[in-house]
């Protein structure tokens, strides 16, 4: 769960991928656009995985 406390990181690259991250301040999973390269582990393919792993309150 320590990955859930990492800040959102859109990464590099020219990709346009809809992803989700856990916002530790609001304790919710939120969407962001991922560039496709780099970033960190607070990056989920769907909101369900974000909710399951980070136990967000908006799930």
Swiss-Prot record:
Keywords: Disulfide bond, Ion channel impairing toxin, Potassium channel impairing toxin, Protease inhibitor, Secreted, Serine protease inhibitor, Toxin, Voltage-gated potassium channel impairing toxin. CDD domains: Kunitz_KTT. The record marks 14 as: Key residue that directly interacts with the S1 pocket of trypsin. One of its GO terms (molecular function) is toxin activity. Residues 4-54 form the BPTI/Kunitz inhibitor domain. GO terms for biological process: envenomation resulting in negative regulation of voltage-gated potassium channel activity in another organism. It is found in: Secreted. Disulfide bonds join 4-54, 29-50, 51-59. SUPFAM superfamilies: BPTI-like. Transmembrane segments: none annotated. SMART domains: KU (SM00131). Belongs to the venom Kunitz-type family. Scorpion delta-Ktx subfamily. Delta-Ktx 2 sub-subfamily. Dual-function toxin that completely inhibits trypsin activity at a molar ratio of 1:1 (Ki=136 nM) and that inhibits mKv1.3/KCNA3 potassium channel currents (IC(50)=129.7 nM). Negative results: has no effect on chymotrypsin and elastase. This is Kunitz-type serine protease inhibitor BmKTT-1. It comes from Olivierus martensii. The lineage of its organism: Eukaryota, Metazoa, Ecdysozoa, Arthropoda, Chelicerata.
């Amino acid at each position: 769960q320590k990955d859930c406390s990492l800040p959102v990181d859109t990464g590099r690259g020219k990709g346009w991928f809809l992803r989700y991250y856990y916002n530790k301040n609001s304790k919710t999973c939120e969407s962001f656009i991922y560039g496709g390269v780099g970033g960190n582990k607070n990056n989920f393919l769907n909101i369900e995985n974000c909710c399951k792993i980070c136990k967000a309150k908006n799930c």
